[in-house]
A protein has these predicted regions:
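Catalytic active-site module of serine/aspartate enzymes centered on a nucleophile-bearing elbow/loop
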Residues: 69-98
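Conserved serine/cysteine hydrolase catalytic core
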Residues: 1-66, 72-73
Length: 98
């Protein structure tokens, strides 16, 4: 997997950790500042049926609180959608962007 190659680089690991750190700090502050605003553009939400998102969240309902027009579904895969379900992902993207 390409992820293994990239994660051999300490800078990549550092950047990944910084992304998670931001999610529980500055991202929360930004979310709070935007609490009364909704994304006006149509939003496509895709997630893996066999991943954490499916088990722990309600993606369409959750995003409907933050966006005016939400579409999407679980794809027949796990966490790594492009690698696990490329054809299904492409079909969804082409349909959404057409």
């Amino acid at each position: 997997m390409e992820y293994r190659r990239c994660f051999r680089d300490p800078a990549a690991i550092h950047a990944s950790c910084e992304d998670y750190r931001a999610a529980e700090s500055i991202d929360l502050a930004h979310d709070e500042a935007d609490i009364d605003r909704k994304v006006a553009a149509p939003l496509l939400v895709l997630w893996g049926k066999y991943g954490t998102v499916e088990r722990c969240f309600h993606p369409l309902a959750d995003w409907a609180e933050r966006a005016e027009s939400v579409h999407g579904r679980a794809l027949d895969c796990g966490h790594y959608i492009p690698e696990e379900a490329p054809a299904e992902l492409l079909k969804e993207l082409v349909t959404f962007l057409s």
